[in-house]
Design a protein with these regions (language model features):
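Conserved class I S-adenosyl-L-methionine
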Residues: 76-86
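Conserved SAM-binding loop of SAM-dependent methyltransferases across substrates and taxa
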Residues: 86-98
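A short beta-strand submotif of the Rossmann-like class I SAM-dependent methyltransferase core
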Residues: 146-152
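S-adenosyl-L-methionine-dependent methyltransferase catalytic module, highlighting the catalytic core
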Residues: 3-4, 9-68, 87, 106, ...
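Glycine-rich phosphate-binding loop signature in dinucleotide/nucleotide-binding domains
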Residues: 72-76, 138-142
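Active-site flanking residues adjacent to catalytic metal/cofactor-binding acidic residues
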Residues: 81, 104, 150, 182
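Conserved SAM-binding motif I beta-strand of class I
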Residues: 99-105
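Structural signature of beta-strand start/N-cap positions in the alpha/beta core
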Residues: 79, 100, 143-145, 176
Length: 276
């Protein structure tokens, strides 16, 4: 007894229990925040609405790529491989009946670029391009006269040499590979950088549908593909997709600036197999 008051004995286990409860409560709140952020992101990038928006926005790209394919591989009976099943596959099927797709498991793939058309009869090779560095597990299949590799490369977090080497292994002799990808040196990105804004996409929360991990310049594409036995026979630029809405004056100015091809938003490279 000190001054007629007894000393309280604090139980350290009780204090620890309270701290653990507070910590768990904080973690639960943060988990809820992250889940909500992911939900919003998935609605924007991976929902049925976002899929249809993507299809509508990229119709011109699909048509242009089909024309480019027809120019380099005119034979409609050619064996064609489309990397990453999407609505582009449906466009290719309009001319080439023998189209196969390659990519993630169709039942597990929740990406926002998936097809809107029915394609149950189209053959599919299940292979994750992130495993391209594993030469021992490359799928064994027939060769293809034409491979379409459109708007996929920028989503991959693996050295592109592995991917291009894998695709080279699937090409028939003198086969054609058409690659399209965002132009890392697009004038819009240059302007954003000049204003102190990061021109490239942030890493996404929903890893099943990654955004753009790495974009490439025209010269990079050529150097990478040529290093693994492909010959670049043509490079060109397109302005895909055409922006919607916004100021007419701004749109007119951007159209004028992008009359200079290297300032356009999309880079296209056509490769031929020269090394078995």
């Amino acid at each position: 007894m000190i001054g007629n008051r007894s000393l309280s004995v604090i139980d350290p286990n009780a204090v620890l229990h309270v701290e653990e409860e507070e910590s768990m409560s904080a973690k639960s709140r943060l988990e809820g925040i992250l889940l909500q952020l992911m939900k919003v992101e998935k609605a924007h990038t991976s929902s049925d609405a976002s899929r249809q928006y993507y299809v509508d926005l990229h119709k011109d790209r699909f048509s242009d790529i089909l024309r480019l394919c027809q120019f380099y591989v005119a034979n409609p009976s050619a064996r064609v491989l489309d990397i990453g099943r999407s609505e582009l596959t449906a466009y290719l099927l309009k001319y080439y009946p023998h189209v196969t797709t390659l990519g993630l498991d169709l039942h597990a793939d929740a990406g926002g670029h998936r097809e809107a058309s029915s394609m149950e009869t189209v053959p599919h090779i299940t292979f994750d391009l992130l495993n391209s560095h594993r030469v021992d597990i490359w799928p064994k299949c027939k060769s293809f006269e034409l491979i379409v590799f459109s708007e996929v490369l920028e989503h991959l977090s693996v050295a592109p040499e592995f991917v291009f080497a894998f695709l080279n292994s699937l090409l028939a002799e003198n086969g054609i590979l058409i690659c399209t990808t965002p132009n890392a040196a697009d004038v819009a990105k240059r302007l954003r950088l000049a204003y102190g804004r990061n021109p490239f996409e942030r890493l996404r929360l929903y890893s099943a549908n990654p955004g753009h991990i790495r974009e490439y310049t025209r010269q990079e594409l050529c150097d990478i593909a040529c290093s693994v036995g492909l010959q670049c026979i043509r490079q060109l630029y397109f302005d895909w997709p055409q922006s919607r809405g916004g100021s007419r004056i701004k749109s007119a100015c951007m159209k004028l600036i992008r009359a200079y091809p290297p300032f356009r938003g999309s880079s296209v490279a056509v490769f031929r197999r020269v090394m078995p």
